[in-house]
Curated annotation (Swiss-Prot):
This is Tryptophan 2,3-dioxygenase. Gene3D superfamilies: 1.10.287.3810, 1.20.58.480. It comes from Dictyostelium discoideum. Heme-dependent dioxygenase that catalyzes the oxidative cleavage of the L-tryptophan (L-Trp) pyrrole ring and converts L-tryptophan to N-formyl-L-kynurenine. Catalyzes the oxidative cleavage of the indole moiety. Its cofactor is heme.
Length: 400
């Protein structure tokens, strides 16, 4: 089998293979071996899962005050279940960050990353669907015990805030909660935990570094960006010519179509202006570095090349995580409006009105990956890859 690794600028020579194999072995997260003697002792289901503790930690406030509310048990279990799944998501995110934090990431482990990102998205789908269960509780049912929850709030889910931080949300992009920094609503222990996650290298930062290592942006005389720009320029010019040559269009329609085509040209001209792009980067309007953006566009355009199969899946799953986070926020917002209307939240926030501000691009971590669709071109217009590049992107099997 021949071909370069995606995130390595060279193919390993024979004398390097041993060290690479050793690094892969170290990076692979191996399960600990099970001692034969301990295995013979056996494990009891309830003891292993700590069910005695788990099933006895649902303490209803309504019971404590002598006015049991049937729906409070559902409310507690739903939120405890959310926190368990949040813990699993953090476990997966941390493992992915660990793999990507020691470059170059071995190709073998890219499959592990895909698997774990996929697991995160499946958990997220479950979290979105779980809202439907909570919605079986009516507004009147909730009012039976709602006042007993003050001043607790779902905003205080430290694990959810940790997930946001670990993925790459920045503190200054958050909508202020009751005009205060979000740290203000957590106890000292949780504040320290949140601050620690803010100081960690986020998944977004690691993805940017990973993209920047793409060796095929410039490879043995091949300049992807120059080739791509030439193709785009030709497409835009052809669009203008087709509009002018179309006699079925009225002059007004031609003028409108020409205006749209020129607007498209302006969008691409901004893309090809590195100085202008970096100014946007400084302002926080974009998050990907210019080189990382180029790399992502290359992967999206040539996703059918074997070397880019897995990187494309990784990028696609990252956008899916963002999409599902937005879906969860939206469903949560609609549920809150449905159950409490415009009432003030138990934590003192504006409730529905605050939650509505969190549904949008402001909270998307991988927004730049979504916007790449604006810069993709049809397959039949893609510049042909030079033979030397295509050979290195390919995987070839042969029997000696």
């Amino acid at each position: 089998m021949s071909g370069c690794q995606f995130n390595q600028p060279y193919c390993p020579r024979s004398e390097e293979k041993k060290s690479i194999a050793e690094s892969i072995e170290k990076a692979t997260l191996m399960e600990p071996s099970i001692d034969a003697q301990s295995a013979q002792k056996g494990v009891y289901y309830g003891s292993y899962l700590k069910l005695d503790e788990l099933l006895n930690i649902q303490e209803c406030e309504s019971v404590k005050v002598g006015a049991p509310a049937h729906e409070e048990m559902l409310f507690i279990i739903i939120h405890q279940t959310y926190e368990l799944w949040f813990k699993q998501m953090i476990h997966e995110i941390d493992s992915i960050r660990s793999i990507m934090s020691t470059p170059p990431t071995p190709e073998r482990l890219n499959g592990v990353i895909v698997n774990r990102l996929g697991r995160i998205t499946e958990i997220q789908k479950l979290l979105v669907d779980q809202i439907s269960i909570l919605e079986t509780m009516t507004s009147v049912d909730f009012l039976e015990f709602r006042n007993l929850l003050v001043p607790a709030s779902g905003f205080q889910s430290v694990q959810f805030r940790m997930i946001e931080n670990k993925l790459g949300i920045l503190p200054n992009t958050r909508v202020q909660y009751q005009q205060h920094h979000y740290h203000s609503f957590f106890n000292e222990k949780d504040r320290k935990a949140l601050q620690a996650t803010e100081n960690e290298v986020s998944l977004l930062q690691l993805v940017i570094q990973w993209l920047e290592r793409n060796p095929f942006l410039y490879y043995k005389g091949y300049d992807f960006w120059s080739s791509y720009k030439s193709a785009v320029d030709q497409i835009l010019e052809n669009d203008l010519q087709r509009i002018q040559a179309n006699n079925d269009l009225s002059q007004d329609m031609k003028d409108q179509s020409t205006k749209e085509a020129k607007k498209n040209m302006e969008s691409f001209s901004t893309l090809f202006d590195e100085v202008a792009y970096n100014e946007r980067l400084e302002k926080g309007e974009v998050r990907l570095s210019y080189k990382a953006l180029q790399s992502a566009i290359l992967i999206y355009l040539y996703k059918d090349e074997p070397i880019f199969h897995t990187p494309f899946l990784i990028l696609n799953l990252l956008t899916e995580i963002d999409e599902l986070l937005t879906m969860w926020r939206f469903r949560h917002t609609m549920m809150v409006q449905r159950i409490i209307g415009a009432k003030i939240g138990t934590g003192g926030s504006s409730g529905y009105h605050y939650l509505r501000t969190t549904v949008g691009d402001r909270y998307k971590i991988f927004l730049d990956l979504f916007n790449i669709s604006s810069y993709l071109i049809p397959k039949n217009t893609l510049p042909q890859l030079p033979k030397v590049v295509k050979e290195q992107m390919d995987f070839a099997w042969s029997i000696l």
